[in-house]
Amino acid sequence: MDFVGFEDLKCKDKENSQKVFVIRNDKLGDFILAIPALIALKQAFLEKGKEVYLGVVVPSYTTPIALEFPFIDEVIIEDNHLSATLKNKSIDTLIFLFSNFKNARLAFSLRKFIPYILAPKTKIYSWLYQKSVRQSRSLCLKTEYEYNLDLIHVFCKDHNLPNASIKKIAWKLKDKSKERSIIASKLNADVGLLWIGVHMHSGGSSPVLPASHFIELIDFLYKNLNCEIILICGPGERKATEELLKKVPFARLYDTSHSLVDLAKLCANLSVYIGNASGPLHVNALFDNQSIGFYPNELSASIARWRPFNERFLGITPPNGSNDMGLIDIEKEGENILEFIAPNLSCHTQER
């Protein structure tokens, strides 16, 4: 493992511990937003003087980063044989952190093999779960990671466990200076400067900040800060990012298409992350870096529901409740961003 943090939560006695498996089988950001819930689950058992063997079920895409968390004791890749795999695991509890018909059908197939199965109550197929809890997530009264925590609290209540308090999440690289030098060498970047990561893409269908606005913001930051601007691209995003690079040739391009671990290593070395609401924004939150996210006002994609869990976060939306991301005033917001990140720049420089 290339990262450190949460080692004390690893299960040391698999044979005599309850086996709890958690399913979050959608996108990268959704999995990262489940991390506080997974930590809370582990902590609840420890506060009761017990251990829990924690497994997760994830898509193949998010598997590499799931394997990096020492408190996750087993990672299962979702495939067409998942039901058979889980039936053979002697699992005590299965928790679905989100519900769709595919997951409900899976739960129904496991009812005779797993004593306790929990999921959010949504739509008519919720009866397929052994136990479901109405959360009304579509109302967006809480963040996604808080909804995940609420499910864990239901499990804890049913199993006479405390609702554990969450420690601040701040993952770190084992050898940050070494990894920083490796990345700097790849990008021909100055290892001693402030690094600002910019990701202009989004993994969903929600409105995004136009490329022209990113160009304006990057120019503004480069003129006002002694920094390296690193353009981040993932699968299918390189061509558009190269087009952006033509407009800001002083920037560096870092392609993380082939490795989520490389994305995490980069985020560990950033002082500031800027981008639309997407998976990399949430990966950055693992390191408690400053982050700036651009969001539409529509409820289903709002900051209220999808903000990252790190404390130092600035969310920016179009004015007057609009969903037109082109209405965001970069000249005005650029000043706000500078004001937001300035107090922490000196301490980040000292850390390096």
Set out the residue ranges of the language-model regions.
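Catalytic machinery of carbohydrate-active enzymes
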Residues: 1-352
